[in-house]
Amino acid sequence: MGLQTTKWPGRGAFILKFWLIISLGLYLQVSKLLACPSVCRCDRNFVYCNERSLTSVPLGIPEGVTVLYLHNNQINNAGFPAELHNVQSVHTVYLYGNQLDEFPMNLPKNVRVLHLQENNIQTISRAALAQLLKLEELHLDDNSISTVGVEDGAFREAISLKLLFLSKNHLSSVPVGLPVDLQELRVDENRIAVISDMAFQNLTSLERLIVDGNLLTNKGIAEGTFSHLTKLKEFSIVRNSLSHPPPDLPGTHLIRLYLQDNQINHIPLTAFANLRKLERLDISNNQLRMLTQGVFDHLSNLKQLTARNNPWFCDCSIKWVTEWLKYIPSSLNVRGFMCQGPEQVRGMAVRELNMNLLSCPTTTPGLPVFTPAPSTVSPTTQSPTLSVPSPSRGSVPPAPTPSKLPTIPDWDGRERVTPPISERIQLSIHFVNDTSIQVSWLSLFTVMAYKLTWVKMGHSLVGGIVQERIVSGEKQHLSLVNLEPRSTYRICLVPLDAFNYRTVEDTICSEATTHASYLNNGSNTASSHEQTTSHSMGSPFLLAGLIGGAVIFVLVVLLSVFCWHMHKKGRYTSQKWKYNRGRRKDDYCEAGTKKDNSILEMTETSFQIVSLNNDQLLKGDFRLQPIYTPNGGINYTDCHIPNNMRYCNSSVPDLEHCHT
């Protein structure tokens, strides 16, 4: 029996060839993956070809790349090679900021996110979108897409599309034939004036719809347009021209509704009836003056309501809103209900309104009419048609009625109401007797506490010592006792912790003068006249005038005395002036070698006095003295120092002292 042998060298060669082929294939695949266009930069699965002034997509995009950056170039529609469509690994492409005027062809077939914003795209064809069966997110913001530029049913070709952004284009209506699986649609900042009832008919998966900044009116929205959006969670129709909220809003899942910046002037009672899951509602910047009672009753899940910048008119029609705001749960945040009218409640929060003071034509009586009164009360002649008994010292002041202020009498100033500042706080003063005043007030808004201050106005410009009392907000009157008879008091009421106002704005002050003491009622007319004169002299302004006049009078007297003194001194000085031309001692102290120019010589027996110009005279001490010379002549000299030499008519120097 023979032994079989195997030829191992032939079998080994086959195995070696097999491994060489596999290695070569792997090498080719790896080298293909590692390839990168020369004008781009590759980093793992990212290829960066952005901002390189490219006019076309570079060739040689390697397989395995997932994100392709081609934005901010100059790529046009002719710059997409056919081989780009076969790169299967790319799922995100950035092509914004280029020069495309049509939706591009030959994009990677498996792309899921495509950014084409900030181009000049005007048309969208069905063929271009039919190549992108896996496209889920499409950004076409800030282009030139019009309604006629979109081919019918073009977006329906992208069967996987879920997010479509068409903001800042030229659409005049919502494109018809959108993908049924679309979840978010943005068509804001367009020119949409019409939405047909077919626009959202099959969009049963749409959750977010933004149509802000268009030309929509209630007439341009077909009836039942939004009723098909059964899964809608957020709806924003801001900056349009609606006069009331769109009807038939889907309430099954709607959570956020934004209606601000429209022309809404009324809200029907059933506008929000089905929105039981609504959590956020914004009706700011509209023309709402009032709300129908019960319009928010069905919003049981509401968390935030914003109503800023509406011309809310706070009359009886808004009373239910005030009550509703006081009893809403703490989980609900309401902002913006501020009164814009009437004038006396402008700027006040609706929540803080005191409805007892608002005028209601049918149910609530109006406020009494107040006649302006002078700032201080002074006794006047009693009216013949009214008879009021004199108040006694021990009488008890009646409690004021909260909803009505006392009227102003026409008699001797026993009772008066100060016209309120902007009618937010109304202050009245009732004179009980000569040492007691009762102050009553009524506020249009809720106040935690009041500070009542009073000070006696005396001869001093700053008044007397200021006294004050803190009163709780529930109290509406206070009696001031132990006052001085026939004295003027300044009374101020300051609301504290007011919700809407600063203290300075709502402070109201008044002045009142207490009656004269009843013990002095029998005084004669002269004493009354003296008291009146004394009281008027104590006026701060009169006192200031007297002081100022006295100061001016003293200054005038001092100025007159000073002028008289200077005038007298000037006359006395002018009488002493004598002729002098400015002498120098050296002129005649050199043994007669130089003649003294300050000596007036008279050699004749007679002379005539001639007036000299006063401007040539200089101040100095002048004396005229007769000089007896040795030859019997008379001369004159002015001797200033004892040892001066004299100059005589005979031209002979004399060393003797000057003598008369």
UniProtKB/Swiss-Prot annotation:
Changing R186N: Abolishes homooligomerization and FLRT2-mediated cell-cell adhesion. SUPFAM superfamilies: Fibronectin type III, L domain-like. Residues 36-540 are extracellular. The chain crosses the membrane at residues 541-561. Glycans are attached at N202. It is found in: Cell membrane; Endoplasmic reticulum membrane; Cell junction, Focal adhesion; Secreted, Extracellular space, Extracellular matrix. The keyword Glycoprotein applies. Residues 310-362 form the LRRCT domain. Keywords: Cell adhesion, Cell junction, Cell membrane, Developmental protein, Disulfide bond, Endoplasmic reticulum, Extracellular matrix, Glycoprotein, Leucine-rich repeat, Membrane, Microsome, Repeat, Secreted, Signal, Synapse, Synaptosome, Transmembrane, Transmembrane helix. LRR repeats lie at residues 62-87, 88-108, 109-131, 132-157, 159-181, 183-202, 203-228, 229-251, 252-274, 275-298. SMART domains: LRR_TYP (SM00369), LRRCT (SM00082), LRRNT (SM00013). N-glycosylated. Proteolytic cleavage in the juxtamembrane region gives rise to a soluble ectodomain. Cleavage is probably effected by a metalloprotease. Gene3D superfamilies: Immunoglobulins, Ribonuclease Inhibitor. This is Leucine-rich repeat transmembrane protein FLRT2. It comes from Mus musculus (Mouse).
